A protein has these predicted regions:
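Extracytosolic ligand-binding ectodomains
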Residues: 1-159
Length: 159
């Protein structure tokens, strides 16, 4: 709201923007509930869920990697969300489950605080997004774009 007030609501009315979003599901619900209980606050702040996922993806990739060199961790990141892998979510119990699967040599499919995420061949991540707009001086969510729709949009842009 500092931006809207600083610029003046009359100048930004009906402006649109995009941000990362959370796609509804069990891992998102578990993260939001745990965050609320721990901090007595809503987890919908800028970067809260994406930063959590970044740390989790890195920690899981470090455990998947054959060694802790940059190239090995980089290559392991793609295997954090393996199609057909055993689903793992957020929180300590799910992290422990993921580590047990990794140690057993089984693939995992992480769905985090953001929801499902995927890495392409270049290591770029795709995930859900939201479109926000300024309406009567307030920032409101216009719509959420799920992972599948974001991937289709990315393919259209790339082609």
């Amino acid at each position: 709201m500092d931006f809207v007030n600083g610029v003046g609501a009359q100048f930004v009315e009906d402006f649109f923007g995009m941000d990362n979003a959370q796609e509804p599901g069990p891992s998102v619900d578990a993260f939001n509930d745990a965050f609320q209980k721990k901090w007595n606050a809503d987890s919908k702040g800028p970067g809260v869920h994406t930063q959590y996922d970044a740390v989790m993806v890195l920690a899981l990739a470090m455990n998947i990697a054959k060694d802790l060199t940059g190239p090995s961790i980089r290559d392991a990141i793609r295997r954090v969300h393996t199609p057909g892998g055993t689903p793992v979510g957020t929180g300590p119990a799910e992290f422990k489950k993921a580590l047990e699967l990794i140690r057993a040599g089984r693939p995992i499919k992480y769905s985090g605080a953001t929801g499902p995420i995927e890495f392409d061949a270049n290591g770029d991540v795709s995930g859900p997004a939201l479109v926000w707009k300024i309406n009567n001086g307030q920032i409101v969510t216009d719509r959420t774009i799920g992972l599948t729709e974001m991937q289709a949009l990315t393919r259209r842009i790339e082609n």
